[in-house]
Amino acid sequence: MTEADPVPLARDLLRSRSVTPEDDGAQTVLARALDALGFSIEWLRFGEVSNLVARRGSGSPHFGFAGHTDVVPPGEGWRHDPFAAVIEDGLLFGRGAVDMKGAIAAFVAALAARPANHAGTISLLITGDEEGDAVDGTRRILDHLAASGALPEFCLVGEPTCRARLGDTIKIGRRGSISAHVTVRGVQGHVAYPHLADNPLHRLIPALEALRATTLDEGTAWFEPSSLQITSVDTGNKAGNVIPASASARLNIRFNDRHTGPDLAAWIRDTVARHAPGAACDIGISGEAFLTEPGPVTTLFSEAVAAVTGITPKLDTGGGTSDARFIAAHCPVAEFGLVGTSMHRVDEAVPVSELRALAEIYGRILDRVFR
């Protein structure tokens, strides 16, 4: 089968300055391309965020593709305008080329090369709030689809998963993430008169050490050990002879599926309370750990990747969080996309040849789902 070329749509998408939460027409460009392929378009706007759901067909199997059109700020020092979509030496430059407008264009190209009268349903879940707080994006889309009984049966997310070569990695899970801001109050005073003061650091530091010294787990078959990192300690004190009035610290835990966010939050609070009674703990859970157990879905994806690249992809759970954490609560999900080495960097770029190869891989996935 001759694949459609993803490059023209990728360039059109890259020309939109869709830095979160701005869309700048990116989703309109995508909607126009999908409408031409017979998809119905449903616009979902929450707050400042634009989202769209595109759907074609009916019944089972119901396959979903999830992605985001928003990008991080470009920064400075690019060799080309980051929103000009310049092709040079076989590379397509632009903010979002890798993460992840390129993958969206590749999936649309795969759709364009295949009949529109397939059995079952194809849905695209596209948000403009993945790089930001992720409050009004994929999570809200899923809530809407769940309420209307229109959730996919399984889903592919086009995040850049590959490490060195296209085809080397499929993500089948992600670690959860929990952050804490701990504040201990004391009494300010002169260091020469400690009996007239109360040094909050002397309670905060033992609390932090107790947290740091705890081995949360030894890892699992699919996850590395959970990791707690202290990221800052602050008193706002610029004087070397003053005991501070308060001390605070920030920490983050990336945790595997042996834990839940609420359980870790309770552990943090209990540990801090033992060493620093009365301390305030402001805790936020940005995502739970999830795992799609290897099985028919991951095998289907792996076979499609191997058929195009000759590489058997590694099934992996490393890296940061993604919107797949929201999808996992509703259906099996895996992630596969481009090589991620240049994402979020100055001169983000994708080899045009890899973009076309990704379209072919996505096409092979569609062929296997709807054969």
Curated annotation (Swiss-Prot):
Stored CDD domains: M20_DapE_proteobac
Domain of life: Bacteria
Record's keyword terms, sorted: Amino-acid biosynthesis, Cobalt, Diaminopimelate biosynthesis, Hydrolase, Lysine biosynthesis, Metal-binding, Zinc
EC numbers for this chain: 3.5.1.18
Pfam families, A to Z: M20_dimer, Peptidase_M20
Note on cofactor: Binds 2 Zn(2+) or Co(2+) ions per subunit.
Positions of the catalytic residues: 70, 130 (proton acceptor)
A biological process from GO: diaminopimelate biosynthetic process
Database matches in InterPro entries: ArgE/DapE_CS (IPR001261), Bact_exopeptidase_dim_dom (IPR036264), DapE_proteobac (IPR005941), Peptidase_M20 (IPR002933), Peptidase_M20_dimer (IPR011650), Peptidase_M20A (IPR050072)
Cofactor(s) annotated in UniProt: Zn(2+); Co(2+)
Transmembrane segments: none
Protein residues bound to Zn(2+) 1: 68, 99, 159
One example GO MF annotation: acetylornithine deacetylase activity
Binding positions for Zn(2+) 2 per the UniProt entry: 99, 131, 344
Pathway in which this enzyme or protein is active: Amino-acid biosynthesis; L-lysine biosynthesis via DAP pathway; LL-2,6-diaminopimelate from (S)-tetrahydrodipicolinate (succinylase route): step 3/3
Reaction it catalyzes: N-succinyl-(2S,6S)-2,6-diaminopimelate + H2O = (2S,6S)-2,6-diaminopimelate + succinate
Quaternary structure (record): Homodimer.
Function recorded in the entry: Catalyzes the hydrolysis of N-succinyl-L,L-diaminopimelic acid (SDAP), forming succinate and LL-2,6-diaminopimelate (DAP), an intermediate involved in the bacterial biosynthesis of lysine and meso-diaminopimelic acid, an essential component of bacterial cell walls.
Family: Belongs to the peptidase M20A family. DapE subfamily.
The name this protein goes by in its record: Succinyl-diaminopimelate desuccinylase
Source species: Acidiphilium cryptum (strain JF-5)
